[in-house]
């Protein structure tokens, strides 16, 4: 089970909509880096029944089923997700509804923003730490990336860049 005295990461490793879901292998690698840096943190994957659950379990398998991941803990309703979000230390993953709930509960979050989403529009700017990475953070203004398709834009967001920025975010706000 979960020890509420220890830090908890809620990880949005998948999403309902494919176009809002970062590459699984990159997600698995990034969370593995997190586990190496913060082995004391307990991790809960946030997923809905059906396809999201299948995706979450596949990522868990790709990671080698680390003991830090409590794969069977799942919020079965929005109300349960709110209760869970009140207990976590931070959120990481795909930008989406779960991140909004976490933010409303006053918890910090770092997200990967889908190419179809405007980071400045969706990430709140208030006293709760919230940051993320979008393909537009990687490209320079002179590059012609608007013509790229969604997958090519997502490919610009490397696992190393996500880990470096997320790690800096954790340190900057003294989250762990």
Please tell me what each predicted stretch does.
Residues 1-9:
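Nucleotide-sugar donor-binding and catalytic loop/hinge architecture
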Residues 9-11, 43:
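Conserved hydrophobic helix-helix packing surfaces used for dimerization/oligomerization
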Residues 14-18:
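A short, flexible beta-alpha/helix-coil linker loop
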Residues 19-23:
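Glycine/threonine-rich flexible loop motifs
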Residues 24-115:
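Donor-binding and catalytic core of enzymes assembling or modifying cell-surface/extracellular glycoconjugates
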Residues 56-57, 123-124, 144:
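Short aromatic-enriched loop/helix-cap "lid" or pocket-rim segments at secondary-structure transitions
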Residues 105-133:
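Gly/Pro- and small hydrophobic-enriched strand-loop and loop-to-helix capping segments
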Residues 126-176:
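Leloir-type glycosyltransferase catalytic cores
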């Amino acid at each position: 089970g979960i020890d509420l005295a220890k830090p908890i990461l809620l990880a949005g490793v998948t999403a309902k909509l494919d176009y809002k879901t970062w590459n699984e292998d990159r997600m698995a690698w990034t969370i593995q880096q997190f586990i190496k840096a913060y082995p004391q943190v307990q991790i809960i994957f946030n997923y809905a029944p059906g396809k999201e659950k299948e995706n979450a379990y596949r990522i868990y398998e790709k990671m080698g089923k680390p003991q830090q991941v409590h794969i069977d803990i799942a919020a079965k309703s929005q109300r349960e997700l709110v209760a869970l979000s009140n207990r976590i230390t931070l959120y990481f993953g795909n930008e989406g509804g779960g991140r909004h709930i976490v933010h409303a509960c006053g918890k910090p979050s770092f997200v990967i923003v889908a190419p179809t989403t405007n980071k400045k529009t969706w990430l709140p700017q208030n006293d709760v730490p919230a940051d993320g990475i979008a393909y537009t953070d990687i490209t320079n203004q002179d590059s012609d990336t608007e013509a790229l398709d969604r997958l090519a834009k997502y490919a610009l967001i490397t696992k190393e860049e996500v880990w470096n920025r997320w790690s800096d975010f954790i340190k900057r706000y003294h989250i762990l």
